UniProtKB/Swiss-Prot annotation:
Subunit field text: The RNAP catalytic core consists of 2 alpha, 1 beta, 1 beta' and 1 omega subunit. When a sigma factor is associated with the core the holoenzyme is formed, which can initiate transcription.
Protein encoded by which gene: rpoB
NCBIfam families for this protein: PRK00405.1, rpoB
Chemical reaction(s) catalysed: RNA(n) + a ribonucleoside 5'-triphosphate = RNA(n+1) + diphosphate
Identification of the protein by name: DNA-directed RNA polymerase subunit beta
Any one cellular-component term (Gene Ontology): DNA-directed RNA polymerase complex
Organism: Acholeplasma laidlawii (strain PG-8A)
Any one GO BP annotation for this protein: DNA-templated transcription
Pfam families: RNA_pol_Rpb2_1, RNA_pol_Rpb2_2, RNA_pol_Rpb2_3, RNA_pol_Rpb2_45, RNA_pol_Rpb2_6, RNA_pol_Rpb2_7
Length: 1271
């Protein structure tokens, strides 16, 4: 039996049964949030400002430059921000430069841009006083994708391609029905592929055939193509984009160029360029083929014709790409380049990089030639042009006076591509025709698509028909990436800045430079709005699930495919939702919601990280070959899903000796997601841990490997619903992740520096760190650098205030987002030494720094009088008496006083409430606000408030009378804050905010008062309980202790569960847990049994034997009522059970009198509206079946929507009269009104009276004898 005792922090200790040789530490679990936001603040904001800078006015006179940005300090702390219902933010300012392009005059100033919400150290945002989390979004990466489908009509595989940017127009290629290839730009109508190729700059049919090779597909496409030149092709493409509109070729070319080659409209981002280069590399397709021509470099043959292109040959070619780079399109024909008439300077062959004027530049007023044709463009020439700018053609000025004039011509290049001619052998050994492979220029680094990329993507598309290249799996994690908080925020900033840029341009055009300053030109309202909308209402900005630390942590590590730019829930198919083999170690295959979001919302695996491109990577241990031996090193390598495909990866459970050598010569391993048996010398990497495949919540389920997947899913999800208990206890049977989960969640307090605890109480902990300098007090040396540092010295330093102590304020009785209690308790003692990173105070649902969601209770799997039928739970009254499952809940109630309309007076907080007795206001203080500590029940007044009834302007004498007598009953009505239906408890605290005190309140609000009521909820029948294996149930009976079964030693069972809940559910983990739990409890230890690497059956048997428990884990139980033993031995053990947030107190509801819906006049539904129970169609059938006619009529009329009838019945009951007959239900009247709306005249004639009953109403006298009964 192999185990080791492991300490978790300073306080917790467990017997660890894991078998892993190299234990790799978990990464910081919320780093995905914090690191991304830090990058955005440090570099992202400045990058965005640089992108929009400079902003030019429409007439080009003014230019606005954004320089570096800066952030102020937050105004309030995180706690203070929550109390005041504000945003935890810092003011973002930027240094701005406004330049007059004519005179060169510059004005600089610092401009406030927006309030930027800041991330707290625990990875959350505080918006309007509530903590929120921004969930990461998983989206399709930009890149080039190829797919195939079988056309059943012609029994042939058709390919299609998509060139997808991060932002901008899509390019698509596809095969039509008659073996004709088509292209589409920006989802427009399709054009023949050859038309699209011509538009790129290929002049003749011969050029195209020579470049891409001859094939029947290309020939068929030419027959469909009606264009004969690039100009015609561009015009045709433009007309498809603009629904048949016709323009000259230059205008069409410029329009398409702006769509594809303008960085502001088309953005591949860093990830898109990375994917383009990887996918469109000529060598990636060429591997495994044979060269059709010699590759010649500097006059020598680098690689000879007919060479088989193995990995080694490919590496040689990769280092000498110049040997097969060729220009396909000249710079004059390249679609990417600006049209010739817009290019006013050019390079000359003899002039190197110097620019020369293409035409004379003339002063339009005087006719003087300022720059002659072919004159070099020097700084003196540019200065002369600036002086005469008002006398020169505007187009000329804009061209020459832009700062990148020298770049403009250098960007006018031909299209360079990397080209190889190859051939392959088919299955019969026959040699194929020569296949032309064109790859993109691997030196390309621009963030928009280049013509060489488009040419390469077309070549790849055609190569697929030749059997070269691979189609893509869009669900593979190599093709899906994460947008983290930094990128999501950057996108919102970009939208806000783009709108602000438009406003600024408009303002600049109407502003005289003499009056212009950066401050009055800039209007950043759109930016403020974009950020506010994102944090307030985006699908990815979620109200934080703060019910327990695990729920917090899981939400921060959640990955959603929904939201802007993602997938719509109702359009998502099975493939997107399904588990993919590339999820291994990246996304948890188990933790996902049940219901419509299944598979669209996932959770990051325990060890997963995110790379610079947004791809999820997971760690592996490097495996090396030492001669004939294969050993696993301690070196950790992180691989993305794409990179992993090159490796053969052994399972973490592979047997090894103590030196890390594989014991067996054949090993189970994965390659490309497929599991097989490989020779040990083929292995290149190994999983770091068995738990790397699952998420944090899933990895906290012991014996996960023995549970059915759907039950494990429920177990992982239900742990997040655990209510923090009054006395939390960490599990006896844990998995070892409890400590890290609690530590990284942000719920506990962690020491920043090492030192001695010199002061501790319930509200704060003070730690005195070891000084870095010698400390003296007068002539006495208190501490000498390098000398001894103990508690005595630390205490003196603290008392004399000689060093800067670390003070940690603990959160006391704070309300969470889910109305549960947040309370931090110190777990260190005065005089104790703590290291940096140690947990020094527990939070909710933690014990000694470990996650503690529930309690360890004695469980028996047995039935008891049928009370645990259908998963119901029977519980001992002992658990109620000893507050084992008691939790504290805090409700917040708020009231405001406002100024009313003119002459209506204002609302007041007061103790003098009209028509209310002294008993009702006995707990209010002199202001009229409840005193903390008071016990209140529903209907009690919390804050006395009166509101003026109507318009009045009291005379001076009336004011005097009011002042003396204080009689407010006549003019004021009671609008006090009362405890609502179902509320009550002890008033825990009161917060008072007032404009007079300088508090920030909404417009029109004078005072704001919040009352917090705490309530202790003991567990009761109807509450939901669960284990960690998806074994959930509702408490059906709480039995007195004396009726509960007991063991031979007198131990009473705490909970009885139904044994029938186990076999069909296949969650056997709970059975193993109870046996290990009771064994560990008897031995006085706690156990860590990690998932897939925990206690084996043999080890469990040995532990049970050590604890003196029968091998089958069963024992004789005695009936508490009779003292007789039960006929059969019963499985009894210790299980970790949690109380879930689905409590009966929140759900049970009864209606006496309540509101009715406006149109149908039927009772409202739901607890929140104090609604009734719907008597539905099936319930009506039940009354039909019994023939209960009168009851049925009552249900459908006076108890539902018969307005006249119910008022008459009320009158009859209060006056002791007979119950009258029902009249017409309101829903019938609604039907008649709807028919009338269609132009039909509807009457319901009473046969006896001859009256139209359908038009009777409450508001006229048509209901005889009814009005006298109205109140």
């Amino acid at each position: 039996m192999s185990y080791k005792t492991v300490k978790y922090g300073k306080k917790a200790e467990r017997r660890d049964y894991s078998k892993m040789l190299h234990q790799v530490e978990l990464p910081n679990l919320i780093e995905i949030q914090t690191k991304s936001f830090e990058e955005f603040v440090e570099t992202g904001i400045d990058e965005l400002l640089k992108d929009i800078s400079p902003i030019e006015g429409h007439n080009g006179d003014l230019k606005l430059y954004f320089e570096e940005s800066s952030l102020s300090e937050p105004k309030y702390s995180t706690i203070e921000t929550k109390i005041r219902d504000l945003n935890y933010s810092r003011q973002l300012s930027a240094r701005v430069k406004l330049e007059n392009a004519i005179t060169g005059e510059v004005r600089e100033s610092t401009v406030l841009m927006t309030d930027l919400p800041m991330m707290t150290p625990s990875g959350t945002f505080i918006i309007n006083g509530a903590e929120r989390v921004v969930v990461s979004q998983i989206v399709r990466s930009s890149g080039v994708y190829y797919t195939s489908e079988l056309d059943k009509k012609i029994n042939q595989i058709k390919y299609s391609a998509q060139v997808i940017p991060t932002r901008g127009a899509w390019i698509e290629f596809e095969q039509g029905s008659k073996e004709i290839l088509y292209a589409k730009l920006d989802r427009s109508k399709k054009v023949p592929l050859t038309t699209f190729i011509r538009a790129l700059g290929f002049t003749t049919k011969k050029d195209i055939e020579e470049t891409f090779g001859r094939s029947s597909l290309i020939t068929n496409t030419f027959e469909k193509d009606e264009t004969k030149s690039p100009n015609e092709a561009v015009i045709d493409l433009y007309s498809k984009l603009r629904q048949g509109e016709k323009v000259p070729a230059d205008a069409a070319r410029e329009f398409i160029r702006m769509r594809l080659f303008d960085a502001r409209r088309y953005d591949l981002a860093k990830v898109g360029r990375y994917k383009f280069i990887k996918k469109l590399d000529v060598l990636a397709r060429a591997e495994g083929t044979y060269l059709a021509n010699d590759i010649i470099l500097d006059g020598e043959v680098l690689v000879a014709k007919d060479t088989h292109l193995t990995k080694e040959v490919i590496q040689i070619l990769a280092q000498n790409r110049d040997a097969f780079r060729k220009q396909l399109i000249t710079k004059e024909n390249n679609l990417q380049n600006e049209t010739a008439d817009e290019i006013l300077a050019t390079t000359l062959p003899e002039g190197g990089n110097t620019l020369y004027a293409k035409e004379n530049v003339v002063n339009l007023k005087t006719g003087e030639v300022l720059v002659k044709k072919n004159e070099a463009i020097t700084e003196e020439v540019l200065t002369n042009l600036r002086k005469n700018r008002h006398s020169i053609d505007e187009k000329v000025i804009k061209y020459f006076l832009t700062e990148d004039v020298y770049k403009k011509e250098s960007l006018r290049q031909g299209v360079i591509s990397e080209i190889l001619d190859v051939y392959v052998y088919d299955d019969a050994g026959d040699k194929s025709n020569v296949i032309r492979i064109i790859g993109s220029d691997q030196r390309e680094d621009r963030i928009f698509v280049a013509v060489s990329d488009i040419v390469a993507s077309i070549s790849y598309f055609l190569n697929l028909y030749d059997g070269l290249g691979n189609v893509d799996d869009i669900d593979h994690l190599g093709n899906r990436r994460l947008r983290l908080i930094g990128e999501l925020l950057k996108n919102q900033f970009r939208i806000g800045l783009a709108r602000a840029e438009k406003n600024i341009k408009d303002k600049m055009s109407t502003t005289n430079f003499n009056d212009a300053t950066p401050a009055n030109v800039i209007n950043m309202t759109p930016l403020v709005g974009a950020i506010k909308t994102f944090f307030g209402s985006s699908q990815l900005s979620q109200f934080m699930d703060q019910i327990n630390p695990l729920a917090e942590l899981t939400q921060k590590r959640r990955v959603s495919a929904l939201g802007t730019g993602g997938i719509a829930r109702d359009r998502a198919g099975v493939e997107v939702r399904d588990v993919h083999n590339s999820h291994y170690g990246r996304l948890c295959p188990i933790e996902t919601p049940e219901g419509p979001s299944i598979g669209l919302i996932s959770s990051l695996a325990t060890y997963a990280k995110v790379d610079e491109y947004g791809f999820i990577k997971t760690p592996f241990l490097k495996v090396v070959q030492n001669g004939n031996e294969t050993s696993v090193t301690k070196e950790v390598i992180y691989l993305t899903a794409d990179e992993e495909s090159d490796h053969v990866i052994a399972s973490a459970a592979t047997p090894m000796d103590e030196h890390g050598l594989f014991i067996e010569s054949r090993v189970i391993a994965r390659r490309n997601g497929e599991t097989g048996i490989y020779d040990a010398n083929e292995i290149t990497a190994m999983d770091v841990s068995p738990k790397q495949v699952v998420s944090v919540a899933t990895s906290s389920i012991p014996f996960l490997e023995h549970d059915d997947a759907s039950r494990a899913l429920m177990g992982a999800n239900m742990q997040r619903q655990a209510v923090p208990l009054l006395q939390p206890t960490s599990p006896i049977v844990g998995t070892g992740v409890e400590y890290r989960a609690a530590k990284d969640s942000g719920a506990v307090v962690i020491a920043k520096n090492s030192g001695y605890v010199t002061y501790v109480d319930g509200k704060k902990i003070i730690i005195t760190p070891e000084p870095t300098d010698t400390i003296k007090s007068g002539s006495k040396t208190l501490y000498k650098v390098g000398g001894e540092f103990d508690y005595g010295i630390a205490k003196k330093l603290y008392e004399t205030k000689s060093v800067q102590n670390d003070q940690y304020d603990l959160v006391q009785f704070f309300r969470s987002n889910q109305d549960t209690l947040i309370l931090q308790k110190p777990i260190v003692m005065q005089g104790e030494y703590v290291d940096a990173g140690d947990v020094i105070a527990d939070g909710p649902s933690t014990e000694n720094g470990e996650l503690a969601l529930g309690r360890n209770v004695t469980v028996a799997f047995m039935t008891w009088e049928g009370y645990n039928y259908e998963d119901a739970v029977i519980m001992s009254e002992d658990l109620v008496k000893h507050d084992v499952y008691t939790s504290i809940h805090i409700d917040e109630y708020e009231i405001e006083t406002r100024d009313l309309k003119q002459a209506n007076g204002k609302e007041e907080i007061t103790r003098e409430i009209p028509n209310v007795g002294q008993e009702a206001i006995k707990f209010l203080d002199e202001r009229g606000i409840i005193v903390p500590g008071s016990e209140v029940k529903e209907g009690d007044i919390l804050v006395g408030k009166i509101t003026p009834k109507g318009v009045f302007e009291p005379t001076p004498s009336e004011k005097l009378i009011h002042a003396v007598i204080g009689d407010k009953a006549k003019e004021y009505r009671d609008s006090s804050l009362r405890v609502p239906h179902g509320g009550g408890g002890v008033v825990q605290s009161v917060q008072y905010f007032s404009k007079k005190n300088g508090d920030q309140l909404p417009t029109g609000v004078n005072e704001q008062i919040r009352v917090y009521i705490a309530k202790k909820r003991k567990i009761t029948e109807g509450d939901k309980m669960a284990g960690r294996h998806g074994n959930k149930g509702v408490i059906s009976k709480i039995l007195p202790r004396e009726d509960m079964p007991y063991l031979a030693d007198g131990t009473y069972v705490d909970i009885m569960l139904n044994p029938l809940g186990v076999p069909s559910r296949m969650n056997i983990g709970q059975i193993l847990e109870i046996h290990l739990g009771i064994s560990a409890q008897k031995l006085g230890i706690k156990v860590a049994s990690p998932v897939f690497d925990g206690v084996t059956n043999d080890e469990l048997g040995a532990i049970m034997e050590e604890a003196g428990i029968a091998p089958d884990g069963k024992t004789t139980l005695y009936d508490g009522r009779t003292g007789e033993p039960y006929n059969n031995r019963i499985s009894v053990g210790v299980m970790y059970m949690i109380k879930l947030s689905h409590m009966v107190d929140d759900k049970l509801h009864a209606r006496n009198v309540g509101p009715y819906t406006l149109v149908t006049q039927q009772p409202m539904g739901g607890k929140a509206q104090n609604g009734g129970q719907r008597f539905g169609e099936m319930e009506v059938w039940a009354l039909y079946a019994y023939g209960a006619a009168h009851t049925l009529q009552e249900m459908l009329t006076i108890k539902s929507d018969d307005m006249i009838g119910r008022n008459k019945v009320y009158y009859a009951i209060t006056h002791g009269q007979e119950i009258p007959k029902a009249s017409i239900p309101e829903s019938f009247r609604v039907l008649t009104r709807e028919l009338q709306a269609l132009g039909l005249y509807v009457e319901l004639i009473d046969a006896n009276k001859g009256e139209n009953e359908a038009i009777k109403s409450l508001v006229d006298n048509s209901s005889k004898g009814f009005n006298k009964g109205r109140f």
